[in-house]
Amino acid sequence: MEQGTEGHWLHGGMTFDPSQYHRFEHGKMQCGLCVASWQLTDVQEGDGGFACIPGSHKSNYRPLSQMLSTKNDLGTVKQISAKAGAVIIFNEALVHGTLPWKPENRMRRSILFKCSPGFLSWGGPSKCPIADPTPEELAVYESPHRTGRVTLEGQETS
């Protein structure tokens, strides 16, 4: 983002979308689409950029429209500051968006990595680039599907 770039409205977690969820039951947390936003430049308090309503991913109710406005400061929207190299991790059930970028002397740059459970994906399958892959390696490259998936368990190696 360059100075003067307008923000992006607050979204996520506001209506039922089967890809945007956060659930904790029976000792396990489950969530839908997740994002890791790797900051390539410093973002200081008051700069703008990524903002969210902390804890909103756990809400069972749609926030009031007044709470979703970035124009009126009701104290619900928090801009996240981070140094270059930091990673902000959140799931799409979190109400989030982007505040207008204010600094004149630097741009905002970040790389977003998006992940989802295997049964929920917006992309197609990838071809396995490994020559003679193991069944476990092939499982990583399977196309998204819900039933009959191979479950990979962590194994210690020496």
Region locations from a protein language model:
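Active-site donor-binding loop signature of nucleotide-sugar glycosyltransferases
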Residues: 12, 55, 115
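Double-stranded beta-helix
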Residues: 30-35, 42-99
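Short, surface-exposed loop/helix-turn segments at secondary-structure junctions
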Residues: 11-20, 65-76, 105, 126-131
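Residue-level signature for short turns and capping positions that connect secondary-structure elements
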Residues: 7, 15, 57-58, 95, ...
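Non-heme Fe(II)/2-oxoglutarate
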Residues: 87, 94-158
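Short aromatic-enriched loop/helix-cap "lid" or pocket-rim segments at secondary-structure transitions
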Residues: 5-9, 48-50, 62-65, 122-127
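Conserved double-stranded beta-helix
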Residues: 1-51
